[in-house]
Structures are given as structure tokens and as C-alpha cells.
UniProtKB/Swiss-Prot annotation:
Keywords: Coiled coil, Phosphoprotein, Repeat, Transferase, Ubl conjugation pathway. InterPro entries: ARM-like, ARM-type_fold, Armadillo, RING-Ubox_PUB, Ubox_domain, Znf_RING/FYVE/PHD. It comes from Arabidopsis thaliana (Mouse-ear cress). Residues 330-501 are annotated as: Disordered. It comes from the Eukaryota. This is U-box domain-containing protein 4.
Length: 826
């Protein structure tokens, strides 16, 4: 009891903490405080009296001590820029437990057969019990759970729900929302380092919710009443106001100087828009954008706002405004028209005679009903047509909100506590894999940006795979799996002033466009297992026994043997070598045709783990594994298909296997998995198709199998596969069939988005694809220009990777030559 009292006192002393008066911490501190102030007098009496409590009561006091200590840890561990949403979910999962334990404690005291101190009369205990029971609060965690369910079902969450979440978690302004997104990314980074896959997926879902809050603010801003439409790219993502002093940060994004400076001064060294770590904090004036804005304002008689008089960063664009005026985020934002009639907007609407800054979303002709239109045809006053037949365009946000972030199946068992489905929870939480469920965690660094790479089995502690090297594009534009070339073009940089303003306009891109799997830092590879390795002779003996069991006619024996081999192959490279030399590979390949799904899953996962060793790669291919792997790809369980695709990728690292796999008919099933598989399966299929697309003969087969349509769909940031999809598309863009498919499927607008807002590697690959499209087709060249590719290409030519700069400069040079050529023929 003395320990409990010390814990209560420690918690109450937190009232002097510097963060305790911040929202939402003050609210939750008071809730815990109310519970403990009812409990403390009772605990004081028990300690000072001779009362002897029984085992049940003693256990209740122990649980209370643990709960109080947990709450202390939660409040003490919160730092500036920690996630508020994550804190709320954690504390709300603890509060009901603490409250119930206190109720149980009081009831145990009332029913105790031991003599109670006079101060603990039944009446006083009953009074305390009633106080506790009446301390009930609305739990926002249940609202968040509902929003996550709606999100996974593709029906929401609604604006009202977003407002409710924002109000109850202290996210009421644009800056608070942007900081929360960064905080959740960092929280996810920690979960990734500890390989807590369920937590990573859960945090991904929360990040999408926060992104939608930001999208809502943008939508409010863009739908404000105005007689003049303004380019969305003239708005600062931080201030949501038109920029008067635009500057470029190291990520290549442009912000209002005063706002991004204050952001950096807060200690935030992350780009608010792309979440990339800022490599330096130098702010480079963007004179081109500044001139364009000034010219536009003069043409349209619009007065620029005074940045010094702008609303405080902490009071920007309140989320609460216009709840009923903005369509649901579950609706197709990009396929609606916004009326020009006056609305009762929030206080940020213009009250002067001058037009206020806004954007009006209009329908884009030919927009696919199955995918949000990425360009919307609202013409901007003061910008006319041009020799290329350009129609200056602008539009609303990319509506990634309709698509659920369909990562590995996730559900919430309790507020703030995420888990995967019941069939897989054990393997994720305990770091173990059941016989029928083989989860893989990263064993290699991603080759496409920082997205997840085909991996070995759960808790893989092996060395990085030798094939895990960055994708880079060669001179032809094709991307290869290999070190990025350090050479860069000597093309002279040109200012945007070389281009007419006619080429500057573009439709609004997803202003908060990001990839759920984008990292703030590189993935940490697990250290070798701490378990003491057994003597190799012991492993050899065990493997020899298991190889004999693989030959058994008993399904149970085969199932158990394949499961044990899979686990052995998971642990370390020595085991893989022993198994590879034991003759097990041929038998495992044969078992890929097993009618027992568990045996088949074990066999394919064992082969995947074994293939991490390069010698085993060759042995697996020589054992005739390609066709059996295709059989699994076509007929296996979801997890077996995933691991089959990952194994095919691993084998395709060897050049001759690329040809064998392509000629064996694997491309069709891989494309089917790409379009219809699980999120994990889609990633594995995309990575396998990337390696296969390096071989020239495979490219046409990949296009003919319908891969381009699926790849373009997977460029939706919510899918977490933007970089993977762009890498494959860049290779396919080197053949005519690939270019035609990309153009026909609407890939050009999305590639331009990646150039503007993607990761460093994504920008490079997207620029390579656009270069192929533009230089080989006048029609596609015009489409690229119409999508407003020039400004992001100029930014990329100055701040991208060496090869990205080379591609961007080559494309800008081509545009310039085309324009001058057309002028000469005039």
C-alpha cells in the first residue's frame, strides 16, 4: 500500500510539469487526478490502520499501482512534438482499466469479512463508489476506431468525425495537424526498428486519418467563395495563404519564408509536405514563383496578403469551420463542381471587395470513375492557350481518401491497441511463427525508396541480401538494380523564365501527398540473433533427419519437417548453407505441389529463406523450382502466393533466371497478384516484376498482361507502393507498348505528381519515364506540359539526385527545343 501511495503522490506532482497544461494532456491529467483523489483517502486509511486485507484486495492494490505507474510514464515520456493521437489512444486504454480496478477495490472492501477501520464505513465507501461510477467520459478512441473501420471499408471518415477527432486530440490548426503527422511518422519509425509489424500497420492507418484532416483544411480553403480562381500551387502548404516571399527548402518544396522559418525554428527538420528530412536549413528564394504570383495578382487585380499580419501559426484555418459546407471526404472530391454562390464560410474568407484566394474544383473530362481524376479543367483568368494547345488547368485535391490504406489486415481489440487477425496475432506479438502462418520481416534494405522489400521469414535476423541495391536508371531511361551512377549531366540550368507562363499552370496535386511507407530514416536491419548457435554438426544431424522426413508418405510428417526447415533457414546463414548442401532443396521443390496447404506454405517459405544465400539461388533454379513456384502463385493460399512471388524475385537477381522466369509463364500470375493480391502480395509481385522488366523480352509480356493499369492504380499514396510502381513503369516506358499503355491508362498526371512530391528515388524514376514518354510522342509531350510538369522539373533539376537532375534537365531542354522549333516554323 505504501508503494501505491508513493505512486499516487508522484502522479499528483506532475501538475507542475511544463507540458501538463497543453491540450489534450491537461484534460486527461484531470481525469486521472479525479480518480486518484477519490482513491487516496481510502488508501491512506488502510495504510495507517491495522486493517489486514485478503489476497483479492492485495492483488487489486498491486494492479492499481501498476496502472498509476503506467499513467506516470505516459505523461512523463511525452515530449514536444510527440503524437497527441497516439497519447490519447494509450491513456484512454488505461483509464477504464484503472477506474474498474478502483471500483473492484471498493467493492472488495465493502464485502470484506475483516473489521474495517471506522473511517471506512459502508456509507463512506458507498459514497466513494458512486463518485467513481459517475466519473464517466466520452472516449474519443472509440470514434477513432470507427474512423479506422470506415477508412478500411472505403466509406469515410466523414468531415464531422474528423472535426470530432481534431477537437478531442488538440488538433485544431494546420500546423498542429502537420506536426502530428510528423510525430506519427516518428512513432512508426520506432515500431519498425523493433519490427512490430502490427503497430506499424496501425500507425499507417492513423497517419492517413491525420492526412485527411489536412485535406479537409485544404478543401475548405479551395472552396471559399471567389470570382477569381487562383492556382493551388501559389498557396503555402503551411499557411494555406498565397505566398508573398516563396522559398525552396532542401526537399525541393516551396513555402512562405516566414512560415517555414518558424517551422524550422521550432526544431522541426522535416519537410512538412513530403516528410523528407531536410539535409540543410538554407532557404533559397524562389524568384520565379514570386514573379508568377505577382504577375497573376496584377493581371487579376488581386492584392497580396501581408505575411506579417497573417494569422498566427497556432491559429491557422480552424478545422471546425464549414463542417456542413464541405462534401464528405469519402466522396469523390475530384469529380464534383463547387458552386460559385456565396456561402457562409469561416473568418478567413475575404471581406473586402477584392477577390479572396481560392480554388474551385471542376470536373475533368474523361476522368475514370474508378480512379479520382488527377487533373481538373478549370481555366485560370489571365492565362490563355498556346502553341501546344495547352489548357491551363487547376483542380482540387487528389482524392486518396476513397481508398482504404489496405495494408495487412488490422483490427483494434481495445482502444489504442492494435493487432492483426487472430490467426496471425501470436506470431507478430511473440516473434514466433505458427505452423500455418509464416510472417516475414525485413532482411534487406529496400531497393525502391524506403518501401518494404521482399523479405525472409518472421524475425529474420540474417545479413542484408546481396541483391538489395538501389534502383537507378541508365542512359536509355531503363532502371536497373545496381548502384546509382555518380555522373551527372553538364546541361546548363535554366530559370523558369525561359518558359511562358502558359506552361506553368497545373491542376492541384495532393497537397499533403505522401507515401504511408515513406520513412524519416533508413530501415534498421536486425542485429544477429542473441541465441547461442548450436554446433554445426548438431544442425547437420537435425537437417539430415528432416530431409528423410520430407520423403515420408505421411502428410503430418512432411508438414512438421517443412515447418522445422523453414524455421532453421530463418535463423542464420550457416543454417541455410547446411540445408542447401543437404539435398533438401529438391525435396522442398517437389512439395510445392503438395495438396496440403500448410506443407506448401512451409515449403515455399523455406525456399524463400534459403534463397537469401546466392549459392542456394542457383541450386533452387537448377532444381526446376520456377514452374512449381508458378503453380503456387496460381493455386496457393494468399501467403503462399506472396512468398512464391518473393522467391521468384530473389531468383530473378541472377540474369539467366530473368529469362527463364519470363519464358515459363510467371508474368501473367504475377500481374494477377499485382492487381488482386493482398497488400503484401502486391508489393512482392511489383518487386518481382521490376527485376523481370530489366530484361528486354519480358517488358512486352508485362505490358500485354495488363500490368500498367494495376501499377497506375498503385501510385495512389494510400497503397504505400508509389516508388515500386514508378520503378516498373520507368522500365516499361522504354518500349512503345509500355508508353502507349501508360498514356492511355492516365499515368502521365500521376508521374508528374511523383516528380513534384515523391521520394528522391521516385522523382528520379518518374522523370526518366516522362523523358521517354515526351521524347517519343508529341501527343504525350503535350500531355506532360498540360499537367504542369515544368515547375517541378525545374525544382528537380536543381535539388534532385544526380541522375534525377540529369533526367529533368534533359526533359526541360527537350521542351525548350520543341518550343523554339515551333516558333521558328511559325
Amino acid at each position: 500500500m505504501e508503494v501505491l501511495l508513493r505512486s499516487i503522490s508522484s502522479f499528483l506532482n506532475l501538475s507542475s510539469s511544463k507540458h501538463i497544461d497543453l491540450d489534450p494532456f491537461e484534460k486527461y491529467y484531470k481525469r486521472v487526478e479525479e480518480l486518484l483523489r477519490v482513491l487516496k483517502p481510502i488508501a491512506d486509511v488502510v495504510v495507517t490502520s491495522d486493517f489486514v486485507f485478503d489476497e483479492k484486495l492485495g492483488k487489486a492494490f498491486e494492479e492499481l499501482t501498476q496502472d498509476v505507474d503506467q499513467s506516470i510514464d505516459l505523461f512523463r515520456s511525452w515530449q514536444a512534438f510527440s503524437s497527441k493521437v497516439y497519447f490519447v489512444l494509450q491513456i484512454e486504454s488505461l483509464l477504464p482499466k484503472m477506474r474498474d480496478t478502483i471500483v473492484d477495490t471498493f467493492q472488495f472492501l465493502m464485502s470484506s469479512k475483516n473489521h474495517l477501520p471506522d473511517e471506512l464505513s459502508p456509507a463512506s465507501l458507498e459514497q466513494c463508489l458512486e463518485k467513481i461510477k459517475h466519473l464517466s467520459y466520452e472516449e474519443i478512441s472509440s470514434v477513432i476506431d470507427g474512423a479506422l473501420r470506415d477508412q478500411r471499408d472505403g466509406v469515410g471518415p466523414s468531415p464531422e468525425i474528423l472535426v470530432k477527432i481534431g477537437e478531442n486530440t488538440g488538433l485544431r490548426s494546420n500546423q498542429e495537424i502537420l506536426i502530428e503527422a510528423v510525430a506519427l511518422e516518428r512513432q512508426k519509425e520506432m515500431a519498425e526498428q523493433s519490427e512490430n509489424n502490427a503497430e506499424v500497420e496501425f500507425l499507417d492507418q492513423l497517419i492517413v486519418i491525420v492526412n485527411r484532416m489536412h485535406e479537409r483544411l485544404l478543401l475548405i480553403k479551395q472552396t471559399q467563395t471567389s470570382s477569381v480562381a487562383i492556382l493551388a500551387d501559389f498557396f503555402c502548404p503551411l499557411s494555406l495563404e498565397v505566398m508573398t516571399d516563396p522559398v525552396i527548402v532542401s526537399s525541393g518544396q516551396t513555402y512562405e519564408k516566414a512560415f517555414i522559418k518558424r517551422w524550422i525554428d521550432l526544431g522541426l527538420k522535416v519537410c512538412p509536405k513530403t516528410r523528407q528530412t531536410l539535409t540543410h536549413t538554407t532557404l533559397i528564394p524562389n524568384y520565379t514563383v514570386k514573379a508568377l504570383i505577382a504577375n497573376w495578382c496584377e493581371t487579376n487585380d488581386v492584392k497580396l496578403p501581408d505575411p506579417n499580419k497573417s494569422t498566427s501559426l497556432n491559429e491557422l484555418s480552424p478545422l471546425l469551420s464549414c463542417t456542413d459546407s464541405i462534401p464528405s471526404t469519402g466522396a469523390d472530391v475530384s469529380a464534383r463542381k463547387v458552386s460559385n454562390k456565396s456561402h457562409d464560410w469561416d473568418a478567413s474568407s475575404s471581406e473586402t471587395g477584392k477577390p479572396s484566394f481560392s480554388s474551385r474544383a471542376t470536373e475533368r473530362e474523361g476522368a475514370s470513375p474508378s480512379r479520382p481524376a488527377s487533373a481538373l479543367g478549370a481555366s485560370s483568368p489571365g492565362i490563355s492557350g498556346n502553341g501546344y494547345g495547352l489548357d491551363a488547368r487547376r483542380g482540387s485535391l487528389n482524392d486518396f481518401e476513397d481508398r482504404s490504406n489496405d495494408s495487412r489486415e488490422l483490427r483494434t481489440d481495445a482502444p489504442g491497441r492494435s493487432s492483426v487477425s487472430s490467426t496471425t496475432r501470436g506470431s507478430v506479438e511473440n516473434g514466433q511463427t505458427s505452423e500455418n502462418h509464416h510472417h516475414r520481416s525485413p532482411s534487406a534494405t529496400s531497393t525502391v525508396s524506403n518501401e518494404e522489400f521482399p523479405r525472409a521469414d518472421a524475425n529474420e535476423n540474417s545479413e542484408e541480401s546481396a541483391h538489395a541495391t538501389p534502383y537507378s536508371s541508365d542512359a536509355s531511361g531503363e532502371i536497373r538494380s545496381g548502384p546509382l551512377a555518380a555522373t551527372t549531366s553538364a546541361a546548363t540550368r535554366r530559370d523558369l523564365s525561359d518558359f511562358s507562363p502558359k506552361f506553368m499552370d497545373r491542376r492541384t496535386r495532393g497537397q499533403f501527398w505522401r507515401r504511408p511507407s515513406e520513412r524519416l530514416g533508413s530501415r534498421i536491419v536486425s542485429a544477429p540473433s542473441n541465441e547461442t548457435r548450436r554446433d554445426l554438426s548438431e544442425v547437420e544431424t537435425q537437417v539430415k533427419k528432416l530431409v528423410e522426413e520430407l520423403k515420408s508418405s505421411s502428410l503430418d510428417t512432411q508438414r512438421q519437417a517443412t515447418a522445422e526447415l523453414r524455421l532453421l533457414a530463418k535463423h542464420n546463414m550457416d543454417n541455410r548453407i547446411v540445408i542447401g548442401n543437404s539435398g533438401a532443396i529438391v525435396l522442398l521443390v517437389e512439395l510445392l505441389y503438395s495438396t496440403d496447404s500448410a506443407t506448401q506454405e512451409n515449403a515455399v517459405t523455406a525456399l524463400l529463406n534459403l534463397s537469401i544465400n546466392d549459392n542456394n539461388k542457383k541450386a533452387i533454379a537448377d532444381a526446376g523450382a520456377i514452374e512449381p513456384l508458378i503453380h503456387v502463385l496460381e493455386n496457393g493460399s494468399s501467403e503462399a502466393k506472396e512468398n512464391s512471388a518473393a522467391t521468384l524475385f530473389s531468383l530473378s537477381v541472377i540474369e539467366e533466371n530473368k529469362i527463364k522466369i519470363g519464358q515459363s509463364g510467371a508474368i501473367g500470375p504475377l500481374v494477377d497478384l499485382l492487381g488482386n493480391g493482398t497488400p503484401r502480395g502486391k508489393k512482392d509481385a511489383a518487386t518481382a516484376l521490376f527485376n523481370l522488366s530489366i530484361h528486354q523480352e519480358n517488358k512486352a509480356m508485362i505490358v500485354q498482361s495488363g500490368a500498367v493499369r494495376y501499377l497506375i492504380d498503385l501510385m495512389d499514396p494510400a497503397a504505400g507502393m508509389v516508388d515500386k510502381a514508378v520503378a516498373v513503369l520507368a522500365n516499361l516506358a522504354t518500349i512503345p507498348e509500355g508508353r502507349n499503355a501508360i498514356g492511355q491508362e492516365g499515368g502521365i498526371p500521376l508521374l508528374v505528381e511523383v516528380v513534384e512530391l515523391g521520394s528522391a528515388r521516385g522523382k528520379e524514376n518518374a522523370a526518366a519515364a516522362l523523358l521517354q514518354l515526351s521524347t517519343n510522342s508529341g501527343r504525350f509531350c503535350n500531355m506532360v506540359l498540360q499537367e504542369g510538369a515544368v515547375p517541378p522539373l525545374v525544382a528537380l533539376s536543381q535539388s534532385g539526385t544526380p541522375r534525377a537532375r540529369e533526367k529533368a534537365q534533359a526533359l526541360l531542354s527537350y521542351f525548350r527545343n520543341q518550343r523554339h522549333g515551333n516558333a521558328g516554323r511559325g
